[in-house]
Amino acid sequence: MKKILTAICVAATTLTACNDNFLEKYPLTDLTEENAFKEYDNFKAFMNPCYEMFTNTTIHTSINNSYMNAQFYGDWYGGLVTHRDNARNPYAYQTITATADGGGWDFSYIRRVNIMLSHLNDGALTEAQAAHWRSVAYFFSAYWYMELIDRFGDVPWVNKVLDESSPESYGPRTPRAEVADSIVARLEYAAANIGNFNDGDNTVNANVVKAALSRFLLREGTWAKYHGLNEPYETYLRKCLTVSQELMDAYPTLYKGEDKQNQPATGYGEMWTTESLKGKPGVIFYKEFVNNVLMNRYNDFEHIAANSADVPQYTVDMFLMKNGLPIGNTASGYQGGKGKDMWGTFADRDPRLYQNIQPPYVVAPHKGAVDNVNTFKSWKFLKAGDNNQGHVVTADEAAKYRYYIDYMGANEKCLRGGSYGGEGMKRCPGQNWGAALTPVSPNLTTDSRVPYMRCRTGYYFWKNYDMWEFSTGSSAFCTADKPIFKIEEVLLNYAEAAWELQHFDQAVADKTINKLRDRAGVAHMTVADINDSFDPNRDKGNAPWWTGKGGKFGNYNVNPVLWEIRRERQIELFGEGFAFYDIRRWAKAAYYVNRQPCGLWTTATDNIYAPKANAYSGQFVDYEEIMRSGRASAENNSAGSGWIYTYESPLAHGGWLDTYYLSMVPTSQRALNKQLTQNPGYKELFGLSD
């Protein structure tokens, strides 16, 4: 019988030659191992396919064509976003299925790295060149192993080329602690020894390595602490402070943006909508897109019906007020809540909210003469006395309807993007790629005014939305670069590691979190003001939605200062795919995943977003009851007002299982290698045999 080998030893490795920068990595010339390592450029060509890790969709922070392709899943699984189209978070509703193959259990990149390492001493390279390529290889192997141990825990550590006769191909999983130490050692070697040999623009260098090291040291250090692993978590966190400080010294300023509208938090928003990130402050490494060479659909999706990312009420509530206070703080000045519309919810909030979620507005479609002040090519502002869908607009309503258009900048042309006349970054009102107007925000899926730019909760995700890019709504034509490593993450890594080591004070807050707040236009964090009552909604270890089948880990009272540090991370990195990594390393998955999602507060009879003609006809739910009891007792369509119902409580399906902290080892791999053990809980969950 033909022997089938585990992926560890037979993972396909195509030998390819590629161009010199991290733009596109398509093969140009086929090589064989016999002729692949004759000169320096051969090593470069052989390693270039490893850059595909940064677009690999099993990594939730990867950049792959659109938000919905990878980052959405990190935020969705992590409980910060929901799916518009009746798709439930599988970790919340226990719809995870047994994994037969795949699931990220893949060692093909590791095999490629090991093949290259085996040829470093063939005589084609100088000592310095060999150290450089060893460093590049160590970086890529460490980066992939970072994901493997985050996903599976113990995994086989493979540091040489294997074949079907190699006993290591059928060996056991290496303990997580050993793999973690090896990852750190490889990244530290790479940071110290990677050279400057002009491998091309935007390729792996010492600072890229340090950024990965900062990420891993925080991730693994906190995982070890909160999961009770026998790992030197304090050593990891101290190293995180050191390497993060080196990067903070190298990147002392943040990107402030270039849009003429000069919105608050412009630099924060434009990190995801700028045509070229080359040389931009704080950008360590990025995915480059170029017209007619390599393009994406990030912005494209957020103009059309295909954008299925929704934001629930509890995530909107996470964002601070502009004065730096949580909305539950009695001094916050929060104007939202029961009986309040979206303008009240958004009033005086952290401007990063407006860069992630489209603010509310109402305009009237228009055709005819224009003055480009109040009346534009395809729309006009509503004035007091105007008739809007059978409703006579009041003066207060007219002012409210236009407030965020003035704030974000008016979409004056409402034409097709690029050479067709689109201009600027985020603008209101919205439009699709056929220059069709979205006259109201939110454009609720139930009773929507137009069939695109719709949302179920009322909170429309538009992090990558801009007006200057061109698309057709069906193909990849967008060219805004996207960050992979940036100093903002490093600042947050430093702040969190400092708190875990009991070093967090006002000086640390000022050089990390308050730098981010200065750019966003949010009041500083004052550490001395953060006490037990600073945020009444803080996770104190007694959240009612913690009940269910999960709960072995994480039912602890989160320190008030740590709560604010974590909040800042979730706000600053929202929409980037970090959530599922973070809630698992904090051992807080049940807290974030088990919450029943819902949308904004509205009414059935006088819907402000689409008066009279398109009043909301969907179901309601009591969000206050959810916050009190963990779930709503009923979805009530007769009350006539309430928060928009989206999904039932995850607790009705059992909620988060602690089994999910690690992924299932694929059954096909265990069939090939009898020494591979299964992660805890999966045998019982799926009735698997040994």
Stretches found by the model and what they are:
Residues P351-R517:
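C-terminal substrate/ligand-recognition segments
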Residues E39-H60, L80-F152, E168-D181, A185-D201, ...:
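Conserved, well-structured interaction surfaces
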Residues N19-V81, E188-Y189, K210, L218-G430, ...:
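An aromatic- and glycine-enriched ligand-binding surface/loop that stacks and positions planar moieties
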Residues M1-L28:
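Bacterial Sec-dependent N-terminal signal peptides
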Residues E147-P156, N198, F216-G228, E500-H503:
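Short coil/turn linking the two alpha-helices of tandem helical-hairpin repeats
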Residues R134, S141, L213, E220, ...:
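Structural register within alpha-helical repeat arrays
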Residues C18-N19, D106-Y109, S182, P264-S332, ...:
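Long, intrinsically disordered, low-complexity segments
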